[in-house]
Curated annotation (Swiss-Prot):
Gene Ontology terms: biological process: DNA repair; DNA replication
Protein known as: DNA ligase
Key word tRNA-binding present: no
A GO term for molecular function: metal ion binding
Naturally occurring in which organism (per UniProt): Rhodococcus jostii (strain RHA1)
Pfam family, one: HHH_2
Family membership: Belongs to the NAD-dependent DNA ligase family. LigA subfamily.
Enzyme Commission no: 6.5.1.2
Gene Ontology terms: cellular component: cytosol
Cofactor: Mg(2+); Mn(2+)
Length: 696
């Protein structure tokens, strides 16, 4: 009995027509991305279009022609630079977007090769592909990917990148090959990208929207001196043709590249089996912002090169490698309007009101624009298609407009001259301020709502039931006049608002919880009281420093600006803001109301805890077994130390837990002492001398 060999159904006319339109749209976006460095849609939106095209071709295989965008690499090359042929074709990578898709790929690979393979997992750099050719150890030429066979020669520009050696070094184990073709990614380190944009703004020029586009534009400058000033980086991640070297594995290839003086990623891991691969995907999904450059996924490669050869390639991508793509952190959407919000300190902030779009795994329709000057600097108009970015837990940000998408119907935003809530004339707090404020601080309804809501925030009293709706309800029902009345609330007060009243007229469960939470909050430490008072510039860090130095609100109030400014972590601006706040009568009334209601206004110092970390900057990275992140921070602060968020030459110690990320690498690079959890405990108990004695 023979198997059926029935031919696949050809695509109907309307499907073929749709395929043609979609393929042309994808080609245009490829051209704008790879050649012009001026995309008008996000990477995520492009992936959706390409995925739709691929799905059509899977359903109707006769649509999959050799010139389909799904079968080609890159977007060709422009005529601005001389063309350069690659010695071996530069392929792209196929993508997966979910762990079950990744496991399916691994299962398919292991059906052909056998189980429990070794895989090399490395972060996927969001940069620009570059091909380097070395002859007898000297850089001969550099070219962009282009269409995978031919790219643009950018040798002079590549020579200006510090990471790219002009001459290779050799070792006994890895002598220099006669010919070596190396593939890698050119990128911007995030701190260098920020510095570049700051310099462009200072020169009155438009900043770049993102590091990837700026890296592409910088690499393709006609004047190499401009490229040199841009401080690009490069990391190598593969080989093309070579004479005199044949790696046994991907890991072996990377070891050789490093021995020759070529840059390789420190964010790689050689693992066995699907579960370990998925673990790496999840780890870097949580730590993608710990890397010095942008990443948009994890690349998984079969490690053994003999198996790579057995698996082979399609016309566009190797079958032995896959890219797991994380949810895109940038998207394009329509800017429907620009509105303003009045904050708790009176600051009037414009914000973007947009068509909802999914970015970084969540739906976003609002994003801050900071102030009127920032709106002008970004050059956004109402009606623009804009690039939106949301990185992890960071507040969504409008990066700028897609100028090429303008229709002529867009129009400029004008900042209001009067408060939209209380109609008070707006003005900067002082001459030269970029922000404008509503000076009606005590009575402006918007500021009142925001201040009451702020009292309950995680950085302040952390009162769960007191959300924005509750704050609004309490004020509108006149259950409170301002935040000063919160800790005196009674059951009768809460019954004035329907939010805390049952249908039968009694106090709801949430009302009871609010009263209980307010009562518990009265014993919170002094630094939380300081944060809750809505003093300009005083966040948890400055509040902890002030509370640690003075111990009571009375002592802080009585201190001079000079005494306040002398506290480590405070400084002149914060000191002046604190002194100014306590000089306002109605502010004093809030403090008096809270004190009368039983809110603790001073800390009880535990004299048994030594101040043995005075002046030391300590960074904690990774997960500790016996300390939460907040507990570790508190333990450092209570001993007089500073719990820093980044590693520098001034860092005294870096405490490393499980999965520490790039801060550990930075510490090693700078020679900063690294402690494990046991070392951290010794440091807390005995200070720096205790860890010095143990040989750290």
């Amino acid at each position: 009995m023979s198997e059926s060999t029935e031919a696949p159904t050809p695509a109907p006319g309307h499907v073929r027509e749709h395929w043609n339109e979609l393929a042309e749209e994808v080609r245009q976006h490829q051209f704008r991305y790879y050649v012009r460095d001026a995309p008008i849609i996000s990477d995520g939106e492009f992936d959706v279009l390409l995925g739709e095209l691929n799905d059509l071709e899977n359903q109707y295989p006769d649509l999959r022609t050799p010139d389909s965008p799904t079968q080609l690499v890159g977007g060709g090359f422009s005529t601005d630079f001389a063309s350069a042929d690659h010695l071996e074709r530069m392929l792209s990578l196929d993508n997966v977007f979910a762990t079950d898709e990744l496991r399916t790929w691994i299962s398919r690979v292991e059906q052909e090769t056998g189980p429990d393979l070794h895989y090399l997992c490395e972060v996927k750099i969001d940069g620009v592909a570059l091909n380097l050719v070395y002859e007898n150890g000297r850089l001969d030429r550099a070219a962009t990917r282009g269409d995978g066979r031919t790219g643009e020669e950018v040798t002079l520009n590549a020579r200006t990148i510090d990471d790219i050696p002009e001459k290779l070094t050799g070792t006994d184990e890895y002598p220099i090959p006669a010919l070596l073709e190396v593939r890698g990614e050119v990128f911007f380190r995030l701190e260098d990208f920020a510095a570049l944009n700051a310099a462009l703004v200072e020169e009155g020029k438009a900043p770049f929207a993102n590091p990837r586009n700026s890296a592409a534009g910088s690499l393709r400058q006609k004047n190499p001196a401009v490229t040199a000033r841009r401080r690009l980086g490069m990391i190598c991640h593969g080989l093309g043709r070579s004479e005199g070297f044949e790696p046994v594995s991907q890991y072996d290839a990377y070891t050789a590249l490093a021995a020759w003086g070529l840059p390789v990623s420190t964010h790689t891991a050689r693992v066995t089996g699907a579960d370990a691969v998925v673990d790496r995907v999840q780890y870097w999904g949580e730590h993608r912002h710990d890397v010095e450059h942008e990443i948009d996924g994890l690349v998984v490669k079969v490690d053994e090169t003999s198996l790579q050869r057995r698996l082979g390639s399609t016309s566009r991508a190797p079958r032995w490698a896959i890219a797991y793509k994380y949810p895109p952190e940038e998207a394009t959407t329509k800017l429907l309007d620009i509105r303003v919000n009045v904050g708790r300190t009176g600051r009037v902030t414009p914000f973007a009101y947009m068509e909802p779009v999914t970015v970084a795994g969540s739906t976003v329709s609002l994003a801050t624009l900071h102030n009127g000057s920032e709106v002008k600097r970004k050059g956004v108009l109402i009606g623009d298609t804009v690039v939106l970015r949301k990185a992890g837990d960071v507040i969504p940000e409008v990066l700028g407009p897609v100028v090429d998408a303008r229709t002529g119907d867009e129009y400029e935003f004008v900042m209001p001259t009067h408060c939209p809530e209380c109609d008070t004339p707006l003005a900067p707090a002082k001459e030269g301020d970029a922000d404008i404020r509503c000076p009606n601080q005590q009575y402006c309804p918007a500021q009142l709502r925001e201040r009451v809501f702020h009292v309950a925030g995680r950085g302040a009293f952390d009162i769960e039931v007191l959300g924005y709706e509750a704050a609004t309800s309490l004020l509108e029902a006149k259950a409170i006049g301002d935040e000063g009345d919160l800790f005196s609330l009674t059951e009768d007060d809460l019954l004035k608002t329907s939010l805390f009243r049952t249908k039968a007229g009694g106090l709801s469960a949430n009302g009871r919880r609010l009263l209980d939470n307010l009562d518990s909050a009265k014993d919170k430490p002094l630094w939380r009281v300081l944060v809750a008072l809505s003093i300009r510039h005083v966040g948890p860090t400055a509040a902890r420093a002030l509370a640690g130095e003075f111990g009571s609100l009375a002592r802080i109030r009585e201190s001079s600006v000079e005494e306040l400014a002398a506290v480590d972590g405070v400084g002149g601006t914060i000191a002046a803001a604190v002194a100014e706040w306590f000089g306002v009568d109605w502010h004093q009334q809030i403090v008096e109301k809270w004190s009368a209601a039983g809110v603790r206004m001073e800390d009880e110092r535990d004299e048994s805890i030594p101040r043995n970390l005075e002046g030391l900057s300590i960074v904690v990275t990774g997960s500790l077994e016996t300390f939460s992140r907040d507990q570790a921070k508190e333990a450092i602060l209570i001993r007089g130390g500073k719990a820093a968020g980044s590693v520098s030459k001034k860092t005294a110690f870096v405490v490393v837990g499980e999965s520490p990320g790039s801060k550990h690498d930075k510490a090693v690079e700078l020679g900063v002492p690294v402690l494990d959890e046991d070392g951290f405990r010794r440091l807390l108990e005995g200070g720096p001398d205790a860890v010095a004695e143990s040989g750290v």
